[in-house]
Structure formats: structure tokens, C-alpha cells
């Protein structure tokens, strides 16, 4: 028998005035996976997540979390999820232990159980030495780890992570990635929104690409890369080379649209087979297009995103009124 999906959403719509921030998005997240939602700022990622987390009403469409209807039974859904975002929602005047104890109490745990959960999470997230320090003394990475720990106080089976590594340095981002992988190993399901292509590539088993409120592609990282070609020819055009002629040659020989950076003269060409690279280079030579370097690599998610949307993932999409980051513990938690 097929297991109930962790998230099953169809035709999600959210409108703010004249802006259709989420425009008919479908999402299907399997139990036990990391599912990535990738898109630029303002694409609608956070708005979609907030609807799934019961933080925003759904204007049209439907969604279920482990089979529970998000609109009809929001209280039950909140018992199944944890949520954390790019802005830590912990109280700076309290210590790490006090913050976690408070979240446990808000979730209905008895005082002793909340304290035990706090100690367990401090150990799990390597924060024991800082347990009695006020949060004001924490680094950004420590705050983010504590915020994630708070979302796990009642061991929810589904975690929503809204751009959890935004603003972190590379080392701390790597540590957060390890923590997220550990959550899945321990049995959690993770829905991760991100604008970082490498983050989606590193973590997610499957990815939905969101642009201007719509889902424009979905698949595993390898499937998405294969959709724009099996290989990428990377060419550095020599200074003074005719860039327009080079693009025409690529279109004629490879039947593909090159991605050119005019300022640097760097051109990426998606290829259906690596053998096609030789044909393109011969065409350049016969036409007098000079190059200084060349390589053939697997396509990147950046090239996938550009091919699908016509712009990079670091570009701003339409304004997303809910896209200022999720810091949702206070809203999701209910005093019981």
C-alpha cells in the first residue's frame, strides 16, 4: 500500500490585491525525503510554505499534510509540523535552555518534559556549552541552530525550512546542511525553500522550480540537469571575438541557445551529447572565432534555471508579500 504523502497540494493560489503571488502550484512531498523548492526572491516560495503551515489562508486549491486537510483541520496540521526560517525567532533576553523550555510549554508539554526535551536538543545541536548563555551572545549560526531545535521540540514528522541558511557564512552553512541531513536520517521529512542552487543540489532528492508564482519544472537534480542537455560546453571567447557570430554558430550546429556573459566573453552551451562539442569548435575555427579556453562539464542547476526561466536564480521575481522570511514559531504554536 502506498504511504500517505507528507505534503499533497494541488492548485494552490494566493492573491494579494492585484498580485497573484502563488498561481496554481502543485506539490507532492514523499515521507522521508528532502524536497527542495527553488526560486529567486519574490517567486512565491515563502507564500506557498506559509499556506501549507496554516499561517496564511488558501485562496484556491487544496492541501493535505499526512492526509490532514490544511484548511479544515489547521489545529491537527500544526501538531504535525515544525517550521523555521531565515530569521531566528528566539528571545534574545533568555538563555538557550529557557527558550527551548518556553517553546515546549507552549506546545503543551509538562514543565519536566519541556526541560528534558530542551536538554536533548541542546545536546543534539551541539549547544550544551552555551546552554546558560543569553541568546544575545550567540553567533548567527548558533541562533539558527537553536531556532531549528525549537521547531523540533515535540518531534514533528515534517519540518518546513524557509531559506534556513540565508546570510550564513560557508562553514556554518555546511554545518546546517549536515544537521538537515541528520534530521532525515532520524525519520523526519523536510520541505526546504531556497534561492541557493548549490544548496538545492546538495540536499534535495527532488526539486520544484518556482518562478513568478508558478511551478515551472520538477524532478531530481540530475533529471533537471538532463533536461537542458547531457553536457555543457564552456568556452572563453578571445577578446575581440565576434560574440554574435559565435552565438549563431552554436544555434546552427548544436541546435541550442547559448548562455553568454558579454562582459567576460564566457559562453556556456548545453549539448545533447559531448561529441557535439567538437563540431562547435570546428565551426568556430572555420569562421575565425578565436577562443582562449574550453571545457566540457555536466550542466549546473544555474544553467537549468536560466534555460527554464530566462534569468538566474539570484534575480528578483515579482514581489512576494509573504516572502520576507518565515519566523513562525509564535504564530504556529498554540497554548494548550
Where would I find each of the regions flagged by the language model?
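Conserved short beta-strand edge segments in small beta-sheet-based binding/regulatory domains
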Residues: 258-261, 290-297
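ABC transporter nucleotide-binding domains
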Residues: 4-9, 14-211, 216-217
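Preference for bulky hydrophobic residues occupying beta-strand positions
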Residues: 14, 27, 235-237, 269, ...
Amino acid at each position: 500500500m502506498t504511504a500517505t504523502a507528507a505534503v499533497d497540494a494541488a492548485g494552490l493560489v494566493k492573491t494579494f490585491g492585484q498580485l497573484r503571488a502563488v498561481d496554481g502550484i502543485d506539490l507532492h512531498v514523499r515521507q522521508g525525503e528532502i524536497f527542495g523548492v527553488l526560486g529567486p526572491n519574490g517567486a512565491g516560495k515563502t507564500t506557498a510554505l506559509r499556506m501549507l503551515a496554516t499561517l496564511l489562508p488558501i485562496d484556491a486549491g487544496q492541501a493535505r499534510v499526512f492526509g490532514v486537510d490544511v484548511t479544515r483541520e489547521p489545529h491537527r496540521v500544526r501538531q504535525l509540523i515544525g517550521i523555521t526560517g531565515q530569521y531566528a525567532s528566539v528571545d534574545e533576553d533568555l538563555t538557550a535552555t529557557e527558550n527551548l523550555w518556553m517553546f515546549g510549554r507552549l506546545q503543551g508539554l509538562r514543565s519536566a518534559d519541556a526541560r528534558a526535551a530542551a536538554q536533548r536538543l541542546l545536546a543534539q545541536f551541539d549547544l550544551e556549552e552555551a546552554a546558560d548563555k543569553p541568546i544575545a551572545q550567540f553567533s548567527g549560526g548558533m541562533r539558527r541552530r537553536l531556532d531549528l531545535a525549537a521547531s523540533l521540540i515535540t518531534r514533528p514528522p515534517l519540518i518546513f525550512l524557509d531559506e534556513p541558511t540565508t546570510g550564513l557564512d560557508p562553514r556554518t552553512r555546511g554545518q546546517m546542511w549536515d544537521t538537515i541531513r541528520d534530521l532525515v536520517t532520524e525519520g523526519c521529512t523536510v520541505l526546504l525553500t531556497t534561492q541557493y542552487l548549490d544548496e538545492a543540489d546538495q540536499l534535495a532528492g527532488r526539486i520544484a522550480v518556482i518562478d513568478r508564482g508558478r511551478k515551472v519544472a520538477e524532478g531530481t537534480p540530475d533529471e533537471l540537469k538532463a533536461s537542458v542537455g547531457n553536457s555543457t560546453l564552456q568556452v572563453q571567447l578571445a577578446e575581440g571575438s565576434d560574440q554574435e557570430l559565435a552565438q549563431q554558430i552554436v544555434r546552427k550546429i548544436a541546435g541550442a541557445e547559448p548562455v553568454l556573459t558579454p562582459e567576460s566573453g564566457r559562453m556556456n552551451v548545453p549539448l545533447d551529447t559531448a561529441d557535439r562539442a567538437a563540431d562547435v569548435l570546428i565551426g568556430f575555427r572555420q569562421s575565425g572565432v578565436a577562443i582562449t579556453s574550453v571545457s566540457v562539464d555536466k550542466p549546473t542547476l544555474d544553467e537549468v534555471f536560466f534555460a527554464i526561466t530566462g534569468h538566474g536564480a539570484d534575480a528578483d521575481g515579482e514581489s512576494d508579500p509573504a516572502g520576507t522570511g518565515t519566523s513562525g514559531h509564535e504564530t504556529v504554536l498554540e497554548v494548550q
